[in-house]
């Protein structure tokens, strides 16, 4: 069993908090630290987060660690011409990555494949979560509306190293749901 990504809470971190994260992730052999949420509502919010992420990534880099951001739907709101996710990605250093959750990209009304291609080379991790026809999450992969063959193909072409099957609630017993989703991916 190997660790290849940790969600390490909100930014910014104090030096002591960041040092503890560095120590833990080095012990785990995990190179990828992910900010799983930020309350972005405006372009200025996204620009402030980009600045914080650039500063944090610079502190992680000497340890061989990289910083990323995990999206939800609110990052795809527009402030002006651009989505907040685009503002964030376009104002962070290139080694800062997106951990796209394809459910939330689609839920926000965007094509996950387009976003995967747009930020090729900047997404070593990807969350695969299905979108049901009625826009619910938490259904097994292959039972909803997302084209996982195209998503995984685009992810591989974009340099994704690890595809993470994500499901937060289970209509079936959890292990049955996990098996159904894994089987759906393996059939692709």
Question: What are the roles of these predicted feature ranges?
Answer:
Residues 1-3, 123:
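A broad structural signal for short, well-ordered beta-strand segments within beta-sheet-rich domains
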Residues 29, 82-97, 104-188:
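Histidine-acidic metal/acid-base catalytic patches
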């Amino acid at each position: 069993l190997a660790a290849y990504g940790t969600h390490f809470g909100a930014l910014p971190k104090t030096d002591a908090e960041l040092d503890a994260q560095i120590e833990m992730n080095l012990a785990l052999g995990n190179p990828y630290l992910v900010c799983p949420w930020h309350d972005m509502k405006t372009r200025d919010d996204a620009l402030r987060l980009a600045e914080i992420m650039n500063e944090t990534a610079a502190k992680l880099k000497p340890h061989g660690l990289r910083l990323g951001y995990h999206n939800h739907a609110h990052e795809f709101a527009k402030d002006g011409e651009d989505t907040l996710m685009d503002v964030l990605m376009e104002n962070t250093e290139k080694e800062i990555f997106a951990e796209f959750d394809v459910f939330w990209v689609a839920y926000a009304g965007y094509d996950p494949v387009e976003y995967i291609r747009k930020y090729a080379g900047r997404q070593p991790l990807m969350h695969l979560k299905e979108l049901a026809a009625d826009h619910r999450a938490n259904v097994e992969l292959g039972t909803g509306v997302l084209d996982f063959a195209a998503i995984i193909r685009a992810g591989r072409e974009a340099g994704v190293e690890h595809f993470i099957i994500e499901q937060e609630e289970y209509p079936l017993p959890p292990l049955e749901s996990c098996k159904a989703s894994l089987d759906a991916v393996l059939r692709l």
